Amino acid sequence: MFNRKKTSFHRIQVYIFLLSAALSSTFLFSGCSKQDDYPKTRDIDYTVVTGSEIPQELRKMIRERKENAFELSFSCEGELYIVKGYGKQLSPDFSITVNELYLSDNYIVFDTELYGPKQKSTSKAKSYPYIVVKTEYINKSIVFK
């Protein structure tokens, strides 16, 4: 004969498993949709600046922060400098690309990406990759992606 307690316990286990699977798949697939919280109003023209083109005060701020990843902005003489640093890397030859710099209704959106060396480096040199872009001064908060 069947043991009723054992059978009902087994049914509860099956229901819990099915409920867990349904909830897990719901959370998993809901994370796949991309929601654009910052719809583009217009692109912003910019110039990547290096070395002496970067204001001295901003260069000092970068040196102070370069060990760790950082994001900052700096305005000077009607121009806005936006900086994204990736912190200390254990090899040289990293590159950074600007995917987008645009204006949304309430924000400036700055999207960059760090690319590692194409081949494994034998150099022991460390690097501190960062990128500085210069654009017109716009009085809006910056969202870094």
Task: Report residues per predicted region.
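N-terminal Lys/Arg-rich, disordered targeting/topogenic segments
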Residues: 1-9
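Exposed, flexible binding/inhibitory loops of compact, secreted disulfide-stabilized domains
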Residues: 2, 13-15, 28-145
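Composition-driven detection of intrinsically disordered, low-complexity segments
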Residues: 10-11, 18
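Bacterial N-terminal signal peptides
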Residues: 17-27
